[in-house]
Amino acid sequence: MRIDIITVLPELLRSPFEASIMKRAIDKGLVEVHFHNLRDYTTNKQKSVDDYQFGGGAGMVMMIQPIDDCITHLKSEREYDEIIYMSPDGETLNQKMANKMSMYENIIILCGHYKGVDQRVRDHFITKEISIGDYVLSGGELGALVLSDALIRLIPGVLSDETSALTDSFQDNLLSGPIYTRPADYKGWKVPEVLTSGHAAKIEKWREDAAYEHTKNRRPDLLEEH
C-alpha cells in the first residue's frame, strides 16, 4: 500500500511513522508513506495556502489551487483507489471500512486546516470524506494518523501474529472480552479457571460468551448489527 498525505504540517506526521507497527510495516516494504507539503505547490511569494471567505465570515479557507496542483501531480504518476478528505462531517471511520480500505493499493489523504477547504475541492477531487468522531480538531493530521494506523495493521505481514487483528474489537461487531496474563493469582484476584485449563474448545466458548456480554453492557447498539 502507498499512502500519500497532503498537509500543511508534515512535521506533525513524521514521528508516528518512525515507531512501532507503522515503522515495521515501512521497513518490511509493505507500506510506503509520503508527505506532501501544500506550501510547495503554491504560486504566491508568501507560500500561503489559505485566504478569506467569499461573503465574509470567521476563519480562513484552504485555497483550491495548491490542492489541485498537488493532487493532479500525484494522479499523473499512478492511479488511486480513493482520495480522502479528513472532515468532521464525513462518514465515521469504523472497522468494516478499515477492513475494506486495507486492501487498497494507493490512497491520498488530504488534511484540512483552518476553517476547511474550498468546497470545489470536495466537489471535484475528493472521492471519500472520513471523520474519526463527532468533535473538531485543529487539523486533519491526527485523523490521518488514526486512519493510517487502522489500515496498516490489517495489511498481511505487518503484525507478527496476524490472527491478532482478526480477534480485535469490532471485527465481528463485538467488543473484545477480558484478557489476562501472568500471574494467574495476584493479591487474590484470580484469572478465570477456564483460561488455564488447557481445554481449547472451552476457552474459545468462554471468550465468545465474554465478548458478547461485554458488548451487551458497553455497546448494545453493535448487537443490532451482529
From Swiss-Prot:
<dbReference type="InterPro" id="IPR016009">
    <property type="entry name" value="tRNA_MeTrfase_TRMD/TRM10"/>
</dbReference>
<dbReference type="InterPro" id="IPR023148">
    <property type="entry name" value="tRNA_m1G_MeTrfase_C_sf"/>
</dbReference>
<dbReference type="InterPro" id="IPR002649">
    <property type="entry name" value="tRNA_m1G_MeTrfase_TrmD"/>
</dbReference>
<comment type="subunit">
    <text>Homodimer.</text>
</comment>
<keyword id="KW-0808">Transferase</keyword>
<feature type="binding site">
    <location>
        <begin position="132"/>
        <end position="137"/>
    </location>
    <ligand>
        <name>S-adenosyl-L-methionine</name>
    </ligand>
</feature>
<dbReference type="GO" id="GO:0005829">
    <property type="term" value="C:cytosol"/>
</dbReference>
<dbReference type="Pfam" id="PF01746">
    <property type="entry name" value="tRNA_m1G_MT"/>
</dbReference>
<protein>
    <recommendedName>
        <fullName>tRNA (guanine-N(1)-)-methyltransferase</fullName>
        <ecNumber>2.1.1.228</ecNumber>
    </recommendedName>
</protein>
<dbReference type="GO" id="GO:0002939">
    <property type="term" value="P:tRNA N1-guanine methylation"/>
</dbReference>
<feature type="binding site">
    <location>
        <position position="112"/>
    </location>
    <ligand>
        <name>S-adenosyl-L-methionine</name>
    </ligand>
</feature>
<dbReference type="GO" id="GO:0052906">
    <property type="term" value="F:tRNA (guanine(37)-N1)-methyltransferase activity"/>
</dbReference>
<keyword id="KW-0489">Methyltransferase</keyword>
<comment type="similarity">
    <text>Belongs to the RNA methyltransferase TrmD family.</text>
</comment>
<keyword id="KW-0819">tRNA processing</keyword>
<keyword id="KW-0949">S-adenosyl-L-methionine</keyword>
<dbReference type="InterPro" id="IPR029026">
    <property type="entry name" value="tRNA_m1G_MTases_N"/>
</dbReference>
<dbReference type="InterPro" id="IPR029028">
    <property type="entry name" value="Alpha/beta_knot_MTases"/>
</dbReference>
<keyword id="KW-0963">Cytoplasm</keyword>
<comment type="function">
    <text>Specifically methylates guanosine-37 in various tRNAs.</text>
</comment>
